[in-house]
């Protein structure tokens, strides 16, 4: 339908600028929230873990050694999570629009691949981490106590924690809780940026994967494990040591490929990765009752 101003038909144009889509926050960052130190060129990686007998009571001096047999266990991390996207763009389509269609679709596929891998990492933490017995609903008044208690539970098992992944609801609660405490530099940053950053000795991330549908990953046995959106919605936070979430990549490809079957290009991405919580005692999952 033509647009008129008074009695004159006026021109209509399509913008050359593409409105960006919305994607989940980036939080899966090697060296910050996970580790990729076990990456190898293979179909899977098996990590040795020494069986430790623990501490001993002292004896009187002048005793013979008591030998223990060396033993270890294996932690499997398999490259069995593959994500691939392919979008067909006809040259006739690309020539008829003012924006770079191939680049735009490739960028979209890159973001969707990232989102998919992050959802899998979250499912891995949920499934292989340790659920806390505490199920109290978080509020601004008790958020700090819940966090300290979770850290305490990890510490009792000889572990440490330096990362907290928060649901959007809990992150908002933390903003209110942290804002109540007068720490000038920290308080000012929270007010101006809306980001907690570091608090209580840990780095906080708002993770909207908690509220964006089911999360699926394939575990080290090759079994697809699904965490439903309903179960994710009950999670307040996951607290863990970044060194115990392994995220290894065998292949991470993106390309624009000319096709021999049609006049155009394919915008393609593929990621092959593996996920593992190598020490469950250092990953605490805080849920609340429905």
Which residues does each PLM region occupy?
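Glycine-rich, charged/polar anion/phosphate-binding loops
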Residues: 30-33, 148-151, 189-190, 250-254
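N-terminal "assembly arms/tails" that initiate or stabilize quaternary assembly
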Residues: 1-75, 274, 283, 287-288
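Extended, compositionally biased alpha-helical segments that mediate assembly or anchoring
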Residues: 243-290
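Structured, hydrophobic secondary-structure cores that serve as assembly/anchoring elements
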Residues: 52, 65-66, 73-96, 145-181
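Extended oligomerization regions of viral-like shell subunits
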Residues: 41, 46, 155-249
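Intrinsically disordered or highly flexible coil/loop and linker segments, enriched in small
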Residues: 56, 118-122, 159, 250, ...
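Generic, well-ordered alpha-helical segments
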Residues: 39, 57, 69-71, 79-81, ...
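Alpha-helical scaffold segments that mediate packing/assembly in large oligomeric complexes
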Residues: 90-159, 285-290
């Amino acid at each position: 339908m033509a647009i008129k101003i008074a009695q004159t038909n006026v021109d209509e144009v399509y913008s050359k600028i593409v409105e960006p889509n919305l994607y989940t926050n980036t939080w899966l960052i090697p060296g910050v929230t996970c580790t990729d130190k076990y990456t190898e060129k293979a179909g899977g990686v098996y990590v040795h873990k020494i069986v430790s007998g623990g501490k001993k009571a002292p004896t009187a001096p002048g005793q013979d050694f008591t030998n223990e047999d060396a033993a270890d266990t294996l932690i499997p991390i398999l490259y069995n999570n593959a994500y691939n996207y392919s979008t067909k763009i006809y040259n006739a389509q690309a020539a008829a629009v003012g924006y770079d269609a191939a680049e735009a679709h490739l960028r979209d596929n890159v973001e969707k691949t990232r989102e998919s891998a992050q959802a899998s990492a979250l499912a891995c933490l949920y499934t292989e981490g340790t659920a806390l017995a505490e199920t109290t609903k978080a509020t601004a008044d008790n958020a700090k106590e819940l966090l300290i208690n979770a850290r305490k539970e990890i510490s009792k098992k000889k572990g440490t924690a330096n990362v907290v992944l928060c649901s959007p609801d809990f992150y908002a609660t933390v903003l209110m809780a942290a804002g109540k405490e007068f720490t000038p530099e920290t308080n000012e940053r929270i007010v101006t940026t809306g980001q907690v950053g570091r608090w209580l000795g840990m780095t906080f991330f708002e993770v909207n994967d908690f509220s964006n549908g089911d999360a699926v990953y394939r575990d080290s046995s090759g079994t697809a494990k699904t965490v439903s959106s309903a179960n994710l919605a009950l999670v307040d936070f996951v607290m863990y040591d970044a060194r115990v979430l392994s995220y290894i990549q065998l292949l991470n490809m993106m390309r624009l490929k000319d096709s021999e079957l049609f006049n155009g290009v394919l915008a393609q991405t593929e990621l092959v990765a593996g996920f593992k919580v190598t020490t469950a005692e250092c990953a605490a999952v805080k849920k609340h009752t429905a």
